[in-house]
């Protein structure tokens, strides 16, 4: 039997709760039967920094892969040049895969000329807005292969990687840029009957006719205060009798130094609305319960690379309300002139966020209500 290839993964510690960590976990566990993995698991202040953890035996037992191999090196930050050099020598990976904003990896691109002589550099990339980030072109040049998480990202990188206007820029071949959207585990996120005690815990023992669900970090670009204001206006529009049977469930921290004091927002603009905070960190199957409790999941972030919560919501059979931005567009299933848009279409289209051009022309699937921001002026 041929020896499995080994991949050195540079990303958020896959045991953590960030979107990058969650997708790192899904990527590793979904391919652990094909590849061996060594991860530099990043966190801001990692409590286990510097100690290699071999979790291979646990993976073998829990996932039934007898030859599974996974080691994690917890680290403060995403690493550095000396660490990668050391790991190349000790672990001898067949490829390096890094994941998240390229600005965190400038130190890696600075040494690409020595690394790529023996080990290819792979990049799992996302970019959430136009115009095309020309300043990233040199970073993309440093990678042997780029997997694009959204169709918009694919269009951006295909356009930029075709440029050859500088001496060091070489257009990439077709196989070097691929559309690889996040995968949602359908064994976890699916329509299911929610246990009565769990529903009671989330909704405080009350019965509601309509449950709107929001699941994000309490940070400004996610616009949680705007969600509260929108819910308040919705309640005003339908009248008190119906509004009393509606609730907004916000799975987030009510107060965050990087975001907003949401209880204060509620007191100021929506004191009479039913708004519940779900603060407890939940397991994946419990998050699936949340989606199944909801009648709709909303994400109106002003910039969004992908939007895991709404993608998981769709798989649970719950419709979504989303801003037309970044990767959220992919989840709407847009058709233009009767044709379902593909990643290749975005090479020409760029993005559908210009409401004057696309509202009414781009038709979503029945599971999605797209929201175009009228503040985006067509140029």
Which residues fall in each region the model found?
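N-terminal subdomain of nucleotide-sugar transferases
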Residues: 1-57, 91
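Conserved donor-binding/catalytic core segment of Leloir-type glycosyltransferases
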Residues: 9, 205-222, 228-231, 248-249
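Carbohydrate-associated surface elements
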Residues: 152, 183
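A short helix/loop element that forms part of the nucleotide-sugar donor recognition site in Leloir-type
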Residues: 163, 189-205
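Nucleotide-activated donor-binding/catalytic signature segment of Leloir-type glycosyltransferases, i.e.
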Residues: 259-281, 285
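Aromatic "clamp/platform" in nucleotide-sugar-dependent glycosyltransferases that forms part
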Residues: 302
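Short hydrophobic beta-strand element within catalytic cores of glycosyltransferases
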Residues: 319-322, 339-348
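Conserved small/polar residues in nucleotide/adenosyl-binding loops
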Residues: 377-379
């Amino acid at each position: 039997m041929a020896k499995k290839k080994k991949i050195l993964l540079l990303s958020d510690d896959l045991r953590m709760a960030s979107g990058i960590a969650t997708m790192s976990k899904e990527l590793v566990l979904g391919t652990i039967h094909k590849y061996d993995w060594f991860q530099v698991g990043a966190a801001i202040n990692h409590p286990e920094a510097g100690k290699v953890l071999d979790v291979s035996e646990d993976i073998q037992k829990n996932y039934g892969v007898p030859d599974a191999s996974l080691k994690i090196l917890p680290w403060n930050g995403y690493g550095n040049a000396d660490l990668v050099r050391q790991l190349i020598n000790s672990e001898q990976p067949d490829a390096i895969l890094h994941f998240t904003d390229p600005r965190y990896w400038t130190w890696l691109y600075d040494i690409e000329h020595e690394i790529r002589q023996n080990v290819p550099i792979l990049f799992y990339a996302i970019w959430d807005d136009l115009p095309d980030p020309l300043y990233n072109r040199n970073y993309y040049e440093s990678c042997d292969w780029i997997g694009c998480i959204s169709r918009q990202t694919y269009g951006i990188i295909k356009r930029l990687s075709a440029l050859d206007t500088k001496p060091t820029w070489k257009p990439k071949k077709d196989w070097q840029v691929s559309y690889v959207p996040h995968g949602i585990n359908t064994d976890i996120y699916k329509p299911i009957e929610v246990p009565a005690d769990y529903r009671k815990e989330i909704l405080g023992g009350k019965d509601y006719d309509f449950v709107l669900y929001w699941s994000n970090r309490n940070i400004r670009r996610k616009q949680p205060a705007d969600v509260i204001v929108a819910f308040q206006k919705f309640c005003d529009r339908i009248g008190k009798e119906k509004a009393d049977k509606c609730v907004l469930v916000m799975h987030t921290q009510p107060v965050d130094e990087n975001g907003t004091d949401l209880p204060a927002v509620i007191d100021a603009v929506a004191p009479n609305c039913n708004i519940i905070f779900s603060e407890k960190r939940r397991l994946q199957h419990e998050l699936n319960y949340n989606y199944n409790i909801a009648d709709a999941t909303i994400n109106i972030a002003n910039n969004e690379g992908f939007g895991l919560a709404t993608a998981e919501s769709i798989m649970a059979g719950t419709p979504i309300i989303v801003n037309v931005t970044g990767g959220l567009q992919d989840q709407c299933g847009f058709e233009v002139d009767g044709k379902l848009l593909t990643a290749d279409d975005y090479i020409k289209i760029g993005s559908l966020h210009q409401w004057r051009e696309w509202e009414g022309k781009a038709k979503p699937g029945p599971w999605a209500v797209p929201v175009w921001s009228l503040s985006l002026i067509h140029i």
